[in-house]
Amino acid sequence: MSFVTSDHEEFRSAVKRFTEEEIIPIASDLDAKNEEIPMEIITKMAEQGYFGVLFPEEYDGLGLDNITMTIVAEELSKGWLSVGSVMTRGVIMGTLLEAHGTDEQKKKYIPGLATGTVLPAAAFTEPDSGSDSASMIMKATKTDGGYLLNGAKAWCTYANRANVLMVLARTNPDTSLRHKGLSMFFVEKESAEKIVHPNIKGEPIPTVGYHGMRSFNLAFEDVFVPEDSLLGGEENKGFYQLMVSYESARLQTAARAVGVAQAAFDFALQYSKEREQFGKPICEHQAIRMKLSEMKVELEAARQLTYYAASLKDSGKRCDLEAGMAKVKAAKAVEFITREAMQILGGYGYSKEFPVERYWRDGRVISIFEGTSEIQHEVIAKAILK
């Protein structure tokens, strides 16, 4: 069964061309310098409509489906994982707004998300609250006309460039209530190279890979947000509201993994045809042929599972199980494929002369962020043991 139509493939061709012309020529150099995605690239992505793939036309989006969204993420990530990731936060915020936002919040933010002028970042994780997000302690205290936010957040990716932060905070001070006392807020700020906000301090976290989008530790001190920044105008619903975004976020993450895996496979395949040892191309040696075969199997299995989960969501069905499976499979596949690609290149795979080492470093993060593989397995197990 094919989940991808000719229209999907036509869209893929356009994104592939964009990636080859705009992303691939600059990715390795910027990665090596640990520099961020140039804003010119963000602007060009916006002009192509990539930020608005899932949003309705009434909000200046393209009104397309989740399969298209996964294809865009996949093709951009083939060039550089971080470029394919820029859209993830928009997908999360847009999903939150469409499901739970007030009419005013939708009108205020969704058109900007669709056109790339609103660049969000997610401030959910805390130093002592990772997978156990219900244990977070950041406070949102009611005050005249709004709330004061106080506390710390961690691993807030793209916090510097973002002009709005999605912040999950505790509106009920009783921590024993766990997820029942959390609320979602939108905190507006200036987009800059560093964190620019009078009451928010932040420092970037050095990372092994996933360069192009810096992740930050943030400290909030009496950050005032007006009442209309509370998602849906409802307190203590933030955890439940956030759950609606998990499916799309995990689909998009699985697609990013497939993109990185495809890039590594393509490079290793071409190298194996050109590199000669023992008087013939190494692709003619059985050991290398077996590696290439296994890599292809894992790649297509991850891709098709991702498309299948996306097709379920497009049909209006829940796909939290399938999206979780797709993310787990894609995370495993990208680690395996990038590792094997390095092995096929031998010493050159460990060299910064070729991009395979970048694929390897970038691919490793997939099993950690957007819900660890261990958490995904818990979700899967609960579903099958009902």
Whereabouts are the PLM-identified features?
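Short Ser/Thr-interspersed hydrophobic loop/turn segments at strand-loop and sheet-helix junctions
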Residues: 49, 73-77, 168-170, 187-194, ...
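Short Gly/Pro-enriched turn/cap motifs at secondary-structure boundaries
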Residues: 86, 113, 128-131, 155-158, ...
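Helix-loop "lid/cap" segments that line or gate small-molecule binding pockets
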Residues: 91-100
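A short, Trp-centered hydrophobic/proline-enriched beta-strand micro-motif
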Residues: 116-125, 168
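A short core secondary-structure module
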Residues: 150-200
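Flexible, small-/acidic-enriched active-site or ligand-binding loops
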Residues: 193-222
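Long, acidic (Asp/Glu-rich), low-complexity accessory segments flanking structured domains
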Residues: 221-240
